[in-house]
Amino acid sequence: MPNPLRLVISGGGTGGHIFPAVSIAQEVQRRYPEAEIRFIGAQGRMEMERVPAAGYPISGIPIAGFQRKALHKNLSLPLKIWKSLRLVRQHLSAWQPHAVIGTGGYVSGPTLFVAQRMGIPTLIQEQNSFAGWTNRLVSRRAKAICTAYPNMEAVFPAAVTHQTGNPVRPAIAQMLPITEEARRAAKTQLGFDPERKLILVLGGSQGARAINQAVESAETGWRSADHQVLWQCGKFYVEALHARLGEAPGRRIQAFVDDMVQAYTAADIVVSRAGAGTLSELCCAGMASILIPSPNVAEDHQTHNALSLHERGAALHIPESQAFTSLAQTVEDYLAQPEKLEALRSGARALAQPNAASDIVDHLQTLWTWKA
């Protein structure tokens, strides 16, 4: 190809920003196998490892986020921003991309800002129901904005805003409604009793202290009620929990869940944080879920995400401050009432958008002037 399609994608800091970026890249490459796709990430953040592992080159810039709890750490921020803007301009001048995509996180701000001032078409992918300040800042010059939630025209220019959903892993996007036979089979494959209810706990790869504390308080009672627990506690908590609790029938504690399709298929109910990517997966998988959003994220966006599903009958919402006292009984109540579980599953499936990556690339294709 004498003139390959060239794209730059920027986003990171958390998996919720990285995975959509990689999914978009994979969909572009599926359509245009010779496309040249490069990433820009924040130095020292997880995208600098995750993106190369997915097969794409990445260049780091020294950008950092604003520290609300340690203001003295912001003294070097202006210099980091200046250096980042300069590096982005150098990269874009050298690469000459036909379009630039931002999937959020503070690293996408300088990338989109510079691209827009260089006249390069930009697309924003906003995962949350409450837009972050970075995406708000650069939205006025964006050529397309793809959102996961409806009614985002209140904060973004309506003419270029499209609700597409968040990209999820293809295996999860393709999941069919789970039958009881499939659920029992998945429990057996995981080593659980197929006839007993299974509670899946997801605290994220880093873990969530409040969720772990609430589950530790509740799980003995759950198992006494003949329920089982697959507990993904995060890498920072797994050793301490194993040391403190040891082994017990009907309970498995692990840092990660490798096969999420199998775990979702086996689960009768899910307890989870409310990150945008996880919620999109829960909807595609048709899960009955209890969401405990982290209050320690920018603009409290997880609470907005959780409430968006809760208000549409697609999930339950428990504030973190109430998790320790409310989680155990809420799980018990719903496991005892299959019709309530099925209502949540139906509500989640109604919000699923399994074709998000494809829809985003459809909009992306309208931006560039490139021809093969």
Question: Where does each model-flagged region fall?
Answer:
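C-terminal alpha-helical cap of glycosyltransferases
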Residues: 353-372
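Glycosyltransferases and closely related glycan-assembly transferases
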Residues: 87-101, 108-123, 136-144
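Conserved nucleotide-sugar phosphate-binding/catalytic loop shared by glycosyltransferases and other
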Residues: 4-12, 34-80, 164, 237, ...
